[in-house]
């Protein structure tokens, strides 16, 4: 299902629930004469409405997250960003900014990620939970765009992180050091070897860096096997393009 249809159905269900609740309230007013029972009926209808809306929003959010992250439906990503680009609420604006940063990161637009993440982090009212993710994307993008970055400079930057989530902070440091080894220092690093993830892009990312690690260890057969797992995916993804390039350079891409 595309995002436009999903959002249209979600809004239709909300309106339908509101209309149904109004009709039930009117019916209660006509049918029930006892004031106490009318009040009880009204409260019951409202409670049912709020419960339905809560479950509906939860289902809608879960479906969006599944299509965005678990299925990695890139057409859904594009529609989601396009149709929500003019949201008015500040909290929704920053949420869309983070979603845009995540999309740019997957596409290999690391300069855009750095620019937008820094813009977001400059906002004094930005909630810390968003700061954490913007900082993480920023640091990873810096490593992937600066071939002259020294390990000492990287470690200084990592020590200056203000990520308050200890799990994300530790993960960001380990990922950045692994990326440095694999893409700048060109030395093997086993960080990605035992990782797993429920989200598809992260799964593909793990495969890509496992392949890089195998290449640096001289295990070309394993590297080729891993890169071939990626080339069947959407070629607009940065890591798919890199996998295709590797196989072309090796003369093994069909």
Label every PLM stretch briefly.
Residues 61-70, 104-111, 142-152, 177-187, ...:
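Short coil/turn connectors between adjacent alpha-helices in alpha-solenoid helical repeat scaffolds
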Residues 75-84, 110-123, 147-165, 185-199, ...:
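Alpha-helical repeat scaffolds
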Residues 1-77:
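N-terminal alpha-helical membrane-insertion module
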Residues 54, 86-93, 128-133, 165-170, ...:
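Residue signature of alpha-solenoid helical repeat architecture, marking inter-repeat boundaries
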């Amino acid at each position: 299902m595309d995002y436009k249809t999903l959002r249209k159905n979600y809004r239709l269900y909300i309106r339908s629930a509101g209309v149904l609740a109004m009709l039930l309230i009117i019916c209660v007013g006509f049918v029930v004469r006892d004031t106490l029972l009318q009040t009880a009926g009204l409260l019951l209808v409202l409670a049912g409405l709020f419960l339905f809306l809560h479950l509906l929003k939860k289902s809608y959010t879960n479906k969006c997250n599944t299509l965005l992250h678990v299925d990695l439906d890139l057409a859904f990503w594009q529609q989601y960003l396009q149709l929500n680009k003019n949201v008015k609420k500040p909290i929704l604006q920053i949420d869309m900014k983070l979603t845009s940063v995540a999309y740019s990161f997957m596409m290999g637009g690391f300069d855009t990620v750095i620019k937008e993440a820094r813009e977001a982090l400059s906002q004094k009212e930005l909630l810390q939970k968003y700061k954490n993710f913007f900082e993480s994307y920023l640091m990873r993008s810096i490593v992937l765009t600066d071939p002259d970055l020294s390990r000492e400079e990287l470690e200084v930057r990592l020590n200056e992180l203000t990520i308050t989530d200890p799990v994300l902070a530790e993960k960001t440091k380990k990922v950045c050091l692994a990326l440095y080894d694999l893409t700048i220092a060109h030395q093997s690093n086993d960080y990605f070897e035992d990782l797993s993830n429920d989200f598809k892009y992260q799964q593909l990312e793990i495969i890509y860096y496992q392949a890089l690690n195998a290449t640096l260890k001289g295990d070309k057969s394993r590297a080729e096997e891993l890169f071939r797992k990626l080339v069947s995916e959407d070629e607009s993804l940065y890591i798919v393009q890199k996998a295709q390039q590797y196989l072309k350079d090796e003369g093994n891409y069909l």
